[in-house]
Regions:
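Basic, helix-initiating cap at the start of DNA-binding domains
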Residues: 1-25, 33-34, 38, 55-58
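Short hydrophobic clusters on alpha-helical segments that form packing/core surfaces
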Residues: 14-22, 30, 64, 68, ...
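Amphipathic alpha-helical segments enriched in hydrophobic/aromatic and basic residues
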Residues: 22, 31-32, 53-64, 103, ...
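Short hydrophobic/aromatic patch on the recognition helix
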Residues: 39-50
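Hydrophobic alpha-helical connector segments
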Residues: 73-101, 124-126, 142, 152
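Amphipathic alpha-helical segments used for helix-helix packing
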Residues: 97-115, 161-169
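Amphipathic alpha-helical packing segments from all-alpha helical-bundle domains
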Residues: 113-139, 146-150, 175-187
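Amphipathic C-terminal alpha-helical segment
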Residues: 154-171, 186-191
Length: 191
């Protein structure tokens, strides 16, 4: 549904409208024409704010990386060991549930892009650094920390995306299932 009150448009407002479409309707719904409709403008006017669909996707990737890094950094403050691991996992899961479309639309690492975006790379490094602190607090260093971080990301990603998609139909509490999953990974990493 198009916005009734037209506010002054800028890049941030355009990107935020795209996030709203992604989270409400999914990746397949985000087109420039759908975004223009949401904003109550003509599609060509979007080019005043974003560099086409590819530019918008890059802006979304940067926003996703920043929001996730912020969420993980906040969760990590003042914690260590298994408590830090659990808090970071819960923060990551909550983020995926709050921004499912944005999260799913930007899964590729900047490291696989032909042309590196410095801002995206910085935000991804910030997330990685928080992750490495989480791993170090469990005694994981070097390559072991990278493997542990991949296990952490895969665990949270898999659980949270299944949860968002309605993949857990049984009546048992998902929070308890997640807590047990996280505890199992912590136990494995501490061996």
């Amino acid at each position: 549904m198009p916005r009734k009150i037209r506010t002054r448009l800028d890049k941030a407002a355009v990107v935020q409208a795209a996030v709203e479409i992604l989270n409400a309707e999914g990746l397949q719904a985000l087109t420039l024409s759908r975004l223009a409709e949401e904003l109550g403008i003509q599609t060509p006017s979007l080019y005043n704010h974003v560099d086409g669909l590819a530019g918008l996707q890059q802006d979304l990737a940067i926003l996703n990386a920043k929001l996730l890094a912020d969420r993980l950094s906040t969760a990590a403050m003042g914690k260590s060991g298994a408590e830090l691991f659990m808090e970071a996992a819960q923060a990551f899961r909550a983020y995926v549930k709050e921004y499912p479309g944005l999260y799913m639309s930007t899964l590729r690492s900047s490291g696989v892009q032909e042309v590196m975006d410095k801002e995206l790379q910085q935000e991804e490094e910030r997330t990685m650094n928080v992750g490495l602190v989480v791993m170090a607090s469990l005694g994981q260093k070097g390559e072991d920390a990278i493997h542990g971080l991949r296990a952490f990301r895969s665990m949270v990603h898999g659980f949270a995306t299944l949860e968002v998609a309605g993949g857990f139909g049984l009546p048992q509490d998902c929070d308890e299932s997640f807590r047990r999953l996280v505890q199992a990974l912590v136990a494995g990493l501490q061996k």
